[in-house]
Amino acid sequence: MTLPVPLQFKGAPGSPYTRKMLALLRYRRIPYKLLIGDQSTAENLPEAKVGLLPTFYLPNGDGKLEAVVDSTPLIRRFEQDFSGRETIPADPVLTFINYLLEDYGDEWLTKAMFHYRWYYDADIQKAGKILPRWRGLNESSQQLDKMQAYVAERQITRLYVVGSNDITAPVIEDSYVRFLEIFDKIIEKQTFMFGNRPSSADFAIYAQLTQLAKFDPTPAKICLDKAPRVYAWTDVVDDLSGNPADADGFIGRDELGDVLSDMLTEVGRTYVPALLANAQAMMKGEDQMETTIDGRQWVQPTFPYQGKCLQWIRAMFNELSEGDQGFVRALLNGTGCEPLVSSS
């Protein structure tokens, strides 16, 4: 079924996943209508089962609008419904690695985003002031002050959910710095992860950087000091409607190792052990996962959604041909990502 345009969706400037989809729609030149604050209420639109941003309002099989969330499957749906300027490489090997790196951005790099925003005083103060004002520009100062206190308290008390605490803070922060240094080297060679046109993984990385590099003061200073190229890249990706999206814009699979080996090693160093420990804890019915990441203790509540993430990664690997599976295994050898494809 062809989707009607403009696509309607609810979002917020401080939501990285809103920014992910907004930039992707701009790049793909898909008309959209972004609803901020109470604009979605005025439209009398359906409510999502889980209140996440962004929320898209799309017709179901009966033609009735339904609220749809989760950026990763939405991107794949739009790849089917809109032709041209696709963000999923055609090569199955690139498709799999792109999916893995998109998941890393969505699920691991976001830990740094939440951590910095609600762990340090300067970041807490800025987010507390600005987030309510994005939703309520016309609210009174008194009401906004109340919202500032409410938002900050709610988010700080929920930091443990994403794994940010005094034990894990050094792991998260060191991982963020390494990511910046690795990504800086990649975009010195080529503009995007897979060449000269963006993939969905680029938009996932960009999404977190709209906050880490461009909004929250502590990680923004780190980015500006250590990787100003990444800081500038985030501005560029904001609107890629002028990118030519050349047919040969994605690199070949034989170039993946030279370009992405360090990034894949970082994924294997941090995100993979978290995924595996989470899955193991869930299998045992435990409420908390404990493991070692980067040689240090990691403790956080089990995360059912990331249990699904591991299943989806392995399912996508299983869909590859035997030859492509062999190529991926060879590519991931020595990166720490091997368990993702050896126990699937």
Task: Give the label of every model feature segment.
Residues M193-A213:
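GST superfamily/GST-like fold recognition
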Residues D106, L180-D184, D238:
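Structural signal for well-ordered, non-membrane alpha-helices
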Residues V93, I97-L100, V171-R178, I182, ...:
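A non-catalytic, amphipathic alpha-helix used as a structural packing/dimerization or gating element
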Residues K64, A169-E173, P198, A227:
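Amphipathic, non-membrane alpha-helical segments in soluble helical-bundle scaffolds
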Residues M1-Q142, M193, A213-K214, S261, ...:
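GST-like domain detector, emphasizing the conserved glutathione-binding G-site
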Residues L159-G195:
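Short N-terminal edge-element motif at the start of the domain
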Residues Y119, D123-E173:
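Divalent-metal (Mg2+/Mn2+/Ca2+)-assisted nucleotide/phosphate chemistry catalytic cores
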Residues Y206-Q297:
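Active-site/pore-lining binding-face segments in mid-to-C-terminal subdomains
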